[in-house]
Amino acid sequence: MERMLLLSPPSLAARPERLNTILSSHSRYATDLQMLDRVAAGLVSLPQSTYDIVMLLTDVDGLGTGSTSAMGRGVIQSVVRALRPGGKFKRENGTFPSTECPDNTELMLAGLVFDDTGGLLKPDFGPENIVPLKLGKRKPVHSVSSNGTGTSGPHVNMQLSTGSMLKGQTTTIKGVGFVDFTDDPSLSEADIYSGQTDDELIDEETLLDGEDMGRPIIQPPECRPKAGKRRRACKDCTCGLAERLREEDKAARAKADATLETMKLAPKELAEVDFTVQGKLGSCGNCALGDAFRCDGCPYIGLPPFKPGEEVRLLSNDVQL
């Protein structure tokens, strides 16, 4: 019994009486019904090589424009896979247009062909057969035997069961040929791999003259400094910006190191202040000169100038100016 698949456009879903009329004219045991929009959306997958006939139903208006517009490439490929070899794909209201119609391009690209009745047919190429390929006979190789006579036939390495060669016959095993890519065939292999050849080496510096060396270096736009930002060199800078920035950083680092060297104090230049012993001065040496010359953390802040080592006394807790 032939299996049939009915593809219904979405407009027939609102007319159940129309669907019942169509289904009543076909066998319910061998007929399946699928909505075209669900197949196009991928919600329904059609079984492969199952149906002998796939019929595309028309719309409610009978024109078939809705069903034709929903037949995309994915739906056509699903229909072709669902057809058995030799199966037919046809429309309810008649045949498909001629092969010159642009709407049939996807149908023909999917592998369907037009039959005599105007429908589309999936070709049946029959079962796959294995075709043996016969190789031609090997051409005989002409060789010269030990006695000087020419012989023809395949070059066979003949050996006895004991592994010894036949007396009076010598065989030569042909190896794999190598291709020599050198231009000079007179060079030995050692000279080629060692690089000792007569080829003249060209110094790159001789290719530039004084005029070329004096030309200004054209700086690419991406290497030019931007306003408010420090210039940065590219990763593979060739305009000299990387070397210039490296020299500037080196000079700035040397200047900072020189400044730090002048600020360093030797151990002999450091003095420890002990305020419990009279006659000791601070490391700045300005403690006795007054507040104008004292440091922020000096313990003598607020006291009048005094001589080093002199005991200062304030009478009646009055500040002496």
From Swiss-Prot:
A motif (Cx2C motif 1) lies at residues 284-287. Keywords: 2Fe-2S, 4Fe-4S, Cytoplasm, Iron, Iron-sulfur, Metal-binding, Mitochondrion. Gene3D superfamilies: Fe-S cluster assembly protein Dre2, N-terminal domain. Its cofactor is [2Fe-2S] cluster; [4Fe-4S] cluster. Pfam families: CIAPIN1, DRE2_N. A motif (Cx2C motif 2) lies at residues 295-298. Residues 1-131 are annotated as: N-terminal SAM-like domain. Residues 284-298 are annotated as: Fe-S binding site B. Its main location: cytoplasm. Residues 223-239 are annotated as: Fe-S binding site A. One of its GO terms (cellular component) is mitochondrial intermembrane space. Residues 132-213 are annotated as: Linker. PANTHER family: ANAMORSIN. Monomer. Interacts with TAH18. Interacts with MIA40. Belongs to the anamorsin family. HAMAP family: Anamorsin. Component of the cytosolic iron-sulfur (Fe-S) protein assembly (CIA) machinery required for the maturation of extramitochondrial Fe-S proteins. Part of an electron transfer chain functioning in an early step of cytosolic Fe-S biogenesis, facilitating the de novo assembly of a [4Fe-4S] cluster on the scaffold complex CFD1-NBP35. Electrons are transferred to DRE2 from NADPH via the FAD- and FMN-containing protein TAH18. This is Fe-S cluster assembly protein DRE2. The gene is DRE2.
